[in-house]
């Protein structure tokens, strides 16, 4: 009986949802096969900030779904157990982040998981007077009037825009079918349960849909609610709050200063911290920290918790620079101030009574400067016994200079035993021998960026000798199109922090992260402007983010869609 009722309810919901989806057109196919390239036009005007092609329809990531459901239903905690059956969000090759709209689709398995989650959540709320009461607007007298007020208020929040009259009536029809779907429940609660299921299964909830299509001066201005949605998912990874909806309703998001005011308010909200941390975890490759497995015979003073400690340090460090100090990108690369526990203190050579709790410290300025000299980066780019200048160099090239390096040739042999040589000598002889297939990349792009870190061992401890020989950390890497001589990692950190190309790369990552698409030629003018301001010290990270979300490329859309 329960299964038959569930099938009947699903069929009823499917009919209603198909009507509501039809109101928006075909939202499942945003591709236009006539569009050139993956996001950019062929010849955008140089120096002019403009929108790139983007998806009009983008599925919520699983993290966004969780935070949106929590905020929409006003739950005490996100329903993480329900999302465990969601297949993992796919990554897009060459894209650092997990929110690329091109990769976010819905297959049959995920759709089924969404349906089950919607039914579960609707049941939880509709059968709990306290939870349902949080969502019901006050003032209506009859059940029908209360249901209509609920559909209008909840629908605004669920679809991130006001409902049309036809949509309101469609959900009211669904409400009226509640007694048939849930005959054992009171009619009002049963009707709202079915309405909740309908909203939570709607493609207009599961996707962020931008309906604006009217172009002006080669751009499609987004309406106020579309701007609000872009802002909230960029800065909070969730739906707009009441204040942001009010700003949209009152027309405050039609001007740059209104968008900037909301962006600054949102960046001061604790929810922005999670987004800022997620961005830097991807840029600094913090998930790689989980691979830290030092040889305990070689390094007896470290424990299996080193990876966890390193990740915690990175989070505390980034949050302090961005929010505590209102710092700049250069501060991430050069600051000596960080947070340590007892295990990290041992590696950093600090004296004092440290415990498992993290405390703020200033590291030795003769040895440490910025995130690249912290344990997390160094130990995660090392073998269990030796530093790994190759992967350290590749990381800098790709993540900080935005220079992609191709995959290595197949069947490359492992590094040979040192046999009395330093780690640098082994790597050099193995990868830079004239005429070898490796030399072209390693001698110019990889090794020169990795060798300055030879003063740091496999767990990030500072050293001056290697295998009985003095460490040579000098190098001449190419940074921003110029050869720069550095004597060690401290010099390198300073060189990176003062090079505009590095700041442009950091800004480019932010544009990609906040927009959910790869940066393309249309972004170059904004990248150059932000890179210049950041390099000159005039742009704290919070201000950089605000500049991105108030730019023309964020509040308007290219007339052509991203395939």
Region roles according to the model:
Residues 24, 48-52, 70-440, 444-501, ...:
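Active-site substrate-binding loop specific to GH73 endo-beta-N-acetylglucosaminidase modules
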Residues 19-22:
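C-terminal motif of bacterial Sec signal peptides marking the signal peptidase cleavage site
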Residues 1-12:
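Bacterial N-terminal signal peptides that target proteins for export
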Residues 62-68, 72:
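Thiotemplate assembly-line natural product biosynthesis machinery
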């Amino acid at each position: 009986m329960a299964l038959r009722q569930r099938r009947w309810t699903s069929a009823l919901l499917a009919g209603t949802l198909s009507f509501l989806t039809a109101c928006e057109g075909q939202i499942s196919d945003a591709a236009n096969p006539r569009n050139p390239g993956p996001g950019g036009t062929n010849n955008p005007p140089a120096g002019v900030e403009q929108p790139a092609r983007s998806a009009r329809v983008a599925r919520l990531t699983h993290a966004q779904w969780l935070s949106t459901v929590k905020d929409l239903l006003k739950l005490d905690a996100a329903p993480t157990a329900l999302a465990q059956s969601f297949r993992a969000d796919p990554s897009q090759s060459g894209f650092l982040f997990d929110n690329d709209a091109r990769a976010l689709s819905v297959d049959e398995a995920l759709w089924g998981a969404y349906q089950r989650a919607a039914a579960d959540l609707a049941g939880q709320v509709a059968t709990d007077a306290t939870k349902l009461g949080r969502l019901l607007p006050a003032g209506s007298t009859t059940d029908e009037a209360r249901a209509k007020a609920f559909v209008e208020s909840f629908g605004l929040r669920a679809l991130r825009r006001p409902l049309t009259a036809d949509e309101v009536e469609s959900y009211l029809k669904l409400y009226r079918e509640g007694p048939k779907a849930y005959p054992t429940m009171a009619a009002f609660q049963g009707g709202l349960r079915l309405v909740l299921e309908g909203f939570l299964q709607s493609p207009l909830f599961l996707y962020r849909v931008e309906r604006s299509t009217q172009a002006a001066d080669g751009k499609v201005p987004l309406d106020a609610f579309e701007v609000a949605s872009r802002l909230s998912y960029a800065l909070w990874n969730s739906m707009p709050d009441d204040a942001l909806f009010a700003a949209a309703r009152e027309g405050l998001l039609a001007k740059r200063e209104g968008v900037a005011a909301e962006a600054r308010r949102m960046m001061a909200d604790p929810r922005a911290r999670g987004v800022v941390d997620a961005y830097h975890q991807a840029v600094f490759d913090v998930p790689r920290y989980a691979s830290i497995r030092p040889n305990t015979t070689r390094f007896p003073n470290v424990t299996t918790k080193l990876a966890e400690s390193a990740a915690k340090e990175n989070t505390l460090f980034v949050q302090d620079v961005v929010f505590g100090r209102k710092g700049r990108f250069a501060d991430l690369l050069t600051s000596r101030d960080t947070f340590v526990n007892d295990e990290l203190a041992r590696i950093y050579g600090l004296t004092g009574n440290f415990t498992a709790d993290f405390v703020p410290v200033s590291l030795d300025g003769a040895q440490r400067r910025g995130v690249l000299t912290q344990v997390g980066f160094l130990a995660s780019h090392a073998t269990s016994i030796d530093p790994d200048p190759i992967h350290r160099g590749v990381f800098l090239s790709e993540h900080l200079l935005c220079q992609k390096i191709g995959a290595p040739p197949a069947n490359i042999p492992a590094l040979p035993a040192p046999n009395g040589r330093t780690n640098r000598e082994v790597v050099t002889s193995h990868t830079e021998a004239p005429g070898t297939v490796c030399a072209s990349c390693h001698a110019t792009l990889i090794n020169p960026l990795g060798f300055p870190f030879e003063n740091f061992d496999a767990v990030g401890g500072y050293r001056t000798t290697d295998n009985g020989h003095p460490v040579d950390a000098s190098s001449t890497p190419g940074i921003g199109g110029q050869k720069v001589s550095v004597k060690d990692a401290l010099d390198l950190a300073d060189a990176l922090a003062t090079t505009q190309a590095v700041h442009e790369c950091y800004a480019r990552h932010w544009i990609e992260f906040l927009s959910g698409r790869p940066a393309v030629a249309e972004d170059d003018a904004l990248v150059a402007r932000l890179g210049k301001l950041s390099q000159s010290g005039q742009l704290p990270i919070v201000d950089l983010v605000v500049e991105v979300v108030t730019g023309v490329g964020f509040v308007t859309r290219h007339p052509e869609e991203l395939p």
